[in-house]
Amino acid sequence: MTEQITYAAAGVDVEAGDKAVELMKASVRRATRPEVLGGLGGFAGMFDATAIARMDRPVLATSTDGVGTKVAIAQALDIHDTIGFDLVGMVVDDIVVCGAEPLFMTDYIACGKVVPERIAAIVGGIARACEQARVALVGGETAEHPGLLDPDEYDCAGAATGVVEYADILSPDRIREGDVILGLASSGLHSNGYSLVRRVIAHAGWALDREVAEFGRTLGEELLTPTRVYAADLVDLLRDPSVVAGGGVHGLSHVTGGGLAANLARVLPQGLHATVDRATWTPPAVFATVQSLGNVPQSDIERTLNQGVGFVALVPADAVDTTTAFLDARGIPTWVMGQVHDADRAPIDPGHEVIHGAKGVDGGSVQLVGVHR
């Protein structure tokens, strides 16, 4: 008799997928908004757009991202409830850069084997971060890929949509000479540069359970620190009457892949130059540790890691005090780190690299000067 081959024998466990959905239901239900229609398990997530239709000229903003090789740290430690939090930060915080309010998000998880508790932990992290960001988690997909991924391997990605009034879009033409550059502290490495970090610690022979005095915890715990999610606080900042009265926020930049200078250059218009003084802040210990362990050149570390700055806000001088006070009150340490100049009159330091428009954006330029405290 010819042997029967089932889907389960091919490596796909439908029942495990169903169990994962049951385990994640409670957390997903908390990550919602009043506009969400329908429930978990539908073919499509639905979002009532009535309020959007009442806007003068609504513009939708969308973003897609992942968490890169940080998942390898989570897999090595078998800790999966923070990687979803990272995913939300990477996706929804990009949307806020243009002034939009993130509304809803979907996720995608590909794995070699569905372990219900692991999938539920990942989605639980996504849901917690969505709840914090005031974003609805309206759907997702878990795909089992036996033979393509090892049983303990997975990757995840997400996509989100937001909305902004056309008149309120934070475009580069809002930024002016004399604007002040504010740094918003990161929670650590966030979710960029982990291929470099992993290579460095492997080269140094450091185990993830190594206690690191400078961190006050293990290396693995430091590397899995969740990405700070700025979305809700920045949406509120853009609408705060005291900040608006001082001239409002002129620009925002999410410091992700490419580092501080490159991402700041993306939001500057041609003809403007930003000078950022490293002496205005001290990066958390993890950045110096990675650099010294791997003998990583300064230029490379700054093109790869956020160096303790997760977001940048550009504001007129009259809005500096109200903006920093607002963000400090929300638990986001914020400080003055530089200023915007006319490119023709900018104080260029010949000893430091000037970064011009990055990632395909033909914009302004940025120079990091000085040394960290």
Residue positions per predicted region:
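Glycine-/charge-enriched secondary-structure boundary and capping motifs
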Residues: 2-9, 118-136, 149-156, 214-222, ...
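N-terminal amphipathic/basic leader segments beginning at the initiator methionine
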Residues: 2-37
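Residue-level signature of catalytic and energy-coupling elements of molecular machines
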Residues: 13, 65, 178, 254, ...
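Short, acidic Gly/Pro/Ser/Thr-rich loop/turn segments
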Residues: 17, 53-54, 67-70, 165-168, ...
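Glycine-rich phosphate/pyrophosphate-binding loop regions near the starts of catalytic domains
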Residues: 23-187
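Buried hydrophobic packing segments
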Residues: 24, 46-49, 91-92, 197-200, ...
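Acidic-glycine-rich active-site phosphate/pyrophosphate-binding loop
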Residues: 58-60, 66-68, 171-172, 206-210, ...
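Short, acidic (Asp/Glu-rich) active-site segment that either coordinates a divalent metal cofactor
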Residues: 64, 155, 168-220, 261
